[in-house]
């Protein structure tokens, strides 16, 4: 059985638990999905497009690497998908939260096609997930006289990735849910015993409040009752023990 058909079976299994499809994090699975997108008459083409665009785990996963590489091919015209034009490809790269997407954006910004380089630079100026290897590439290009690299560095120096964000609303309506009272830690919301599921946020959510489904449903119901407000969890405690980045 192909990885794709195994994934479809997993989707059916998750439906029984009230879960949406798990985000794709495996490059081998995404490669099959991309191959199906490239085949105009493939029966799973539409589903594959949706998985590719909306359901690939971003960051440094192997699937993110495969997605970024394919988006680069689309931008350079080395591959073609009618539903993903150049603007759409850049938009998807902008939401991929670092890792291989930044590498691709730098390749394009420092490349030979000026129009593409300018578009890539505009996206890079909005990104915050750059690491030393990425900034080293920009520094080297700047020192070599690359004008676009210099422009990107100036943008970062002026913090345009922050100053160009939309203004915070004058008024923010919130509704609070007291998550716990007394001696608690982040284990209440993200139990260490369920650490294996943290990459699958929807599944991991079922462990909130120590697997207390009554309280989980109370929180979801609160959200339904106040669709125009933001739900804030409030731990009524002077300090909260934090042993990791879970908070």
Language-model segments: residues:
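Short amphipathic alpha-helical segments that mediate assembly, nucleic-acid/protein binding
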Residues: 4-7, 30, 45, 67-68, ...
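Generic amphipathic, hydrophobic interface segment in small proteins and small subunits
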Residues: 34-51
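Fe-S-dependent hydro-lyases/dehydratases of central metabolism
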Residues: 95, 107-110, 115-247
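Amphipathic alpha-helical scaffolding segments comprising HEAT/armadillo-like alpha-solenoid repeats
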Residues: 27-35, 58-77, 98-110, 129-141
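N-terminal glycine-rich anion-binding loops that anchor highly charged ligand groups
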Residues: 2, 41-44, 182-187
């Amino acid at each position: 059985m192909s990885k794709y058909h195994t994934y479809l079976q997993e989707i059916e299994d998750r439906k029984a638990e009230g879960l949406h499809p798990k985000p794709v994090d495996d490059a081998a699975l995404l490669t099959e999905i991309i191959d199906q997108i490239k085949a105009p008459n493939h029966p799973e083409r539409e589903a594959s497009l949706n998985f590719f665009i909306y359901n690939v785990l971003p960051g440094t996963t192997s699937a993110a690497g495969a997605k970024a590489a394919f988006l680069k091919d689309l931008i350079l015209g080395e591959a073609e998908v009618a539903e993903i034009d150049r603007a759409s490809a850049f938009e998807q790269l902008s939401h991929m939260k670092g890792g291989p997407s930044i590498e691709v954006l730098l390749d394009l910004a420092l490349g030979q096609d000026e129009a593409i380089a300018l578009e890539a630079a505009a996206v890079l100026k909005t990104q915050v997930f750059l690491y030393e290897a990425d900034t080293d590439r920009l520094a080297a290009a700047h020192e070599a006289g690359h004008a676009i690299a210099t422009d990107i560095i100036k943008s970062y120096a002026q913090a345009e990735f922050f100053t160009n964000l939309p203004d915070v609303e004058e008024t923010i309506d919130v509704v609070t849910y007291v998550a716990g009272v007394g001696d608690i830690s982040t284990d209440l919301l993200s139990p260490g015993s369920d650490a294996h599921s943290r990459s699958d946020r929807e599944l991991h959510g079922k462990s909130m409040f120590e697997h207390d489904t009554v309280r989980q449903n109370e929180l979801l119901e609160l959200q339904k009752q106040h669709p125009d407000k933001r739900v804030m969890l409030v731990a009524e405690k002077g300090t909260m023990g934090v042993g990791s980045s879970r908070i």
